């Protein structure tokens, strides 16, 4: 039997803006989770020093809010890049509109999750199931931002958070908005 060499070619999949988005997003999620835990359940730290020097909780909140803005505008940039990036970054790659994409979703489930097939699904970039899951994750990013800015709107008179003030009553109040915000944090941690 004669062995055949596979012809390989290099494909540039993950453009620099996508890589930057990914790592900025990862750093933001870590910072937001840590500061979010502290905001949700602040430790009781007693200090004999002047109050000016022990304004640590205000600093934690400030870091959380600034990072939230970075997270949101990084997400807005990724939305934009989904229209102008290469074919692997575009939205039509993430939204399975074609029959072939749905077929690949089922094939990946059979191979990687159910393990009833042995032949791996070859894909350049994300396979169709991963793309679909990332599309859902983008919606989770949006909902996380909406709930966060909606909760922040009550404490801020700034223009931008006020754009989201309508979301908290729509969700049934502060408690439900906070619960959704908290649940999505755990989704990102586990994802």
Regions found by a protein language model. Give the residues of each.
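Membrane-embedded alpha-helical bundles that constitute the cytochrome b-like, heme-associated redox core
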Residues: 1-191
